């Protein structure tokens, strides 16, 4: 164990009117008391001393997998164990075998450590970032605040517009959650948008720049191989990954193998130096139901499994990105094959969307697939907003996407039987049956919306204790009628009579 330093982890305490307290996982952490306008002050650097100790002793590999394999329980692992209510040694073992990752760049001291793995709570990622069409630095920091307020466990900065470096710097200095990026976007900007002019040195320079700033994980599309590209020719929607299409264009322009694949060992060196984790990108993921589970998708997945082994040999953490658009009956095949080919490295999926017919509602079409794939063993879900396929999401879209995916993640935790997952459901159900409206609001994922919907028709304070809502009114509420029935049965001793009746019937039937 690195130290015996004591520390506290962020938890959100919900105090109920019956005196009960519920503590939930809290992603907002030290951002809770800050305003986006204060972004130039940053947030506390809670990992500063932990990192300094490792630098002072000359560590050359800053990956949590490196320490885990050496039998060391780091402060980050202890922190995660407290957040997840798990044993620190279990956390270490999961990281050591590659079944979980703890993304934590040595240059992101503001990070409040979290873990991604199938044996832990299902996590969600939110994407933010500017485009060539607009959005300021302050707006992007505000999106970060907004995403973690509603429960994003990690955030990816996908900026492609102006001031990319400065925008990313302030996102990192204000982020209590891991930040991921896709370096190929900025590399493309450096060669004036011409994919054929990309080369490994431009990419490595971009990688080093981002790692130096503190980015915790990189999406690297190293599995888009030259001989897989023809498999996409007859697809309905071709190659839908931006990174995948950029690298496919480079491969075809030069008729050479993907330079991210051929120079993978050089990329590993940068990851090792800063403790950055791989998020191996699915550049050939299906972009429509018709293309799901095809030869291109699964061919790339096999290569990602090979690259995972190469990264693990150097003690670098890896998670695998997944689809995409997949109908419900094909989802389990994705998980089973990923676990087999990638040796149970954490699976990180975009949805998947289970139908293509609902533009404007793809946060719903994808949350259905997300709940299913989470149940089957996926570790982290990348959210989809209502604007998917239509435009750049705004603040409200970010909220809608995060809430939809928090529902999917929690549903998966319930289905997997994660310890403690059902407690919040039980507390809310009890509050609902007892007509404790304020407690129902407080326990919901979005208290503001729950309260506003209730108050649209019954805004008066006295209605916060009423034994009905506007759906049924005072005379048709099933829960109120059930309470009256129970009271009547208790007064008349009906429970004892019922037990006697059941006993007599069993005797008559010879049971």
From Swiss-Prot:
Cofactor: [4Fe-4S] cluster
InterPro entries in alphabetical order: ThiC, ThiC/Bza_core_dom, ThiC/BzaA/B
Positions with a binding annotation for [4Fe-4S] cluster: 469, 472, 477
Biological processes per GO annotation: thiamine biosynthetic process; thiamine diphosphate biosynthetic process
Residues binding Zn(2+), per UniProt: 325, 389
GO molecular function: 4 iron, 4 sulfur cluster binding; carbon-carbon lyase activity; zinc ion binding
Keywords: 4Fe-4S, Iron, Iron-sulfur, Lyase, Metal-binding, S-adenosyl-L-methionine, Thiamine biosynthesis, Zinc
Sites where the protein binds substrate: 127, 156, 185, 221, 241-243, 282-285, 321, 348
Catalysed transformations (reactions): 5-amino-1-(5-phospho-beta-D-ribosyl)imidazole + S-adenosyl-L-methionine = 4-amino-2-methyl-5-(phosphooxymethyl)pyrimidine + CO + 5'-deoxyadenosine + formate + L-methionine + 3 H(+)
Comment on bound cofactor: Binds 1 [4Fe-4S] cluster per subunit. The cluster is coordinated with 3 cysteines and an exchangeable S-adenosyl-L-methionine.
EC number annotated for this UniProt entry: 4.1.99.17
Annotated spans, Disordered: 492-511
EC category name: lyase
UniProt cross-references to Pfam families, sorted A to Z: ThiC_Rad_SAM
Metabolic or biological pathway, per its Swiss-Prot or TrEMBL entry: Cofactor biosynthesis; thiamine diphosphate biosynthesis
GO cellular component, one term: cytosol
Family: Belongs to the ThiC family.
PANTHER family named among the record's database cross-references: PHOSPHOMETHYLPYRIMIDINE SYNTHASE, CHLOROPLASTIC, THIAMINE BIOSYNTHESIS PROTEIN THIC
Function statement: Catalyzes the synthesis of the hydroxymethylpyrimidine phosphate (HMP-P) moiety of thiamine from aminoimidazole ribotide (AIR) in a radical S-adenosyl-L-methionine (SAM)-dependent reaction.
Name used for this protein in its record: Phosphomethylpyrimidine synthase
